[in-house]
Curated annotation (Swiss-Prot):
The lineage of its organism: Bacteria, Bacillati, Bacillota, Bacillota incertae sedis, Caldicellulosiruptorales. The gene is rpsZ. Part of the 30S ribosomal subunit. Contacts proteins S3 and S10. Zn(2+) binds at residues 24, 27, 40, 43. Binds 16S rRNA, required for the assembly of 30S particles and may also be responsible for determining the conformation of the 16S rRNA at the A site. Binds 1 zinc ion per subunit. Signal peptide: none annotated. The keyword Disulfide bond does not apply. The keyword Ribosomal protein applies. This is Small ribosomal subunit protein uS14. GO terms for cellular component: cytoplasm; small ribosomal subunit. Belongs to the universal ribosomal protein uS14 family. Zinc-binding uS14 subfamily.
C-alpha cells in the first residue's frame, strides 16, 4: 500500500503541471494505473471479478 504521506502530498496543488501523476482511487498505488477506470490493475481485477464494474467481463478467445 502507498504511504499516507505520499498520497496527501500528491493531493495538494502542485507548483508545476508536470508534477501531477495519477493514483488509484482505492489503494493509492501510483503504478499500473488504468485511466479509463481510475484504479490500478490490482483493484481493477478485484472489482471485475466481483462484477462491480459494469460492462467488464473476462476475455476468452
Amino acid at each position: 500500500m502507498a504511504r499516507k504521506a505520499l498520497i496527501i502530498k500528491q493531493q495538494r496543488p502542485q507548483k508545476f503541471s508536470t508534477r501531477y501523476y495519477n493514483r488509484c482511487k482505492i489503494c493509492g498505488r501510483p503504478r499500473a494505473y488504468l485511466r479509463k477506470f481510475g484504479v490500478c490493475r490490482l483493484c481493477f481485477r478485484k472489482l471485475a471479478h466481483n462484477g462491480e464494474i459494469p460492462g467488464v467481463k473476462k476475455a476468452s478467445w
